[in-house]
Amino acid sequence: MVEDVAIVGYLPGEAGRYIADLVRAHVPAVPVRRPHITFMPGRPPALPDAELLRRLRQRAQNFLPLELTLGEVRNFLPLSPVLYLDVVAGMAGLDQLRRVLLEATENSHPERFPFHPHLTLAYDQSPEEILALQPRLQAGWAKYPGPRRLRFTQLMLVRQTGPASWQDLGSAAMPGME
């Protein structure tokens, strides 16, 4: 069985650490993955990993770092029991990046849900648990003292290795990476 591949951007610095700690404190039953924004959701690969990574690195050279702003804690109910931080600014750059990523990976698989950029906070919970968690996570996020506008300088190709498990396959730097 071939596992899905996806392209993500890990949250940089203090924001990533804060969100991981926030999730760990309020959703201990769910394994905490490294906080990230998904730029291309998981789908079966159309090309070998080495070729996907080569193309990703080649295309990333044409992009400036992506600046996205995180908003409030929201949920996808009733469609899906997921809590997330909304991406509220930076969509034009993200849409352009997504088009290039889809072309570069030669992937025409339809997405399960319409693409809505976000940072997942909680999943695999009942709708009631999601609704109970939402105000607590929002209160915790409201206390974050840092900037909500984050600069992404790297793309990461990842492979799904289990139901909630992903492995980094390689990164691609966008210009301006330190």
Describe the residue ranges of each PLM region.
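Short, surface-exposed ligand- or partner-binding patches at beta-edge/loop junctions that are enriched
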Residues: 150
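Short beta-strand segments and strand-loop junctions that repeat across beta-rich extracellular domains
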Residues: 153-162
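Basic, often amphipathic N-terminal segments
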Residues: 1-69, 75, 87-146, 163-178
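Short beta-strand element of the conserved SAM-dependent methyltransferase core
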Residues: 85-87, 157
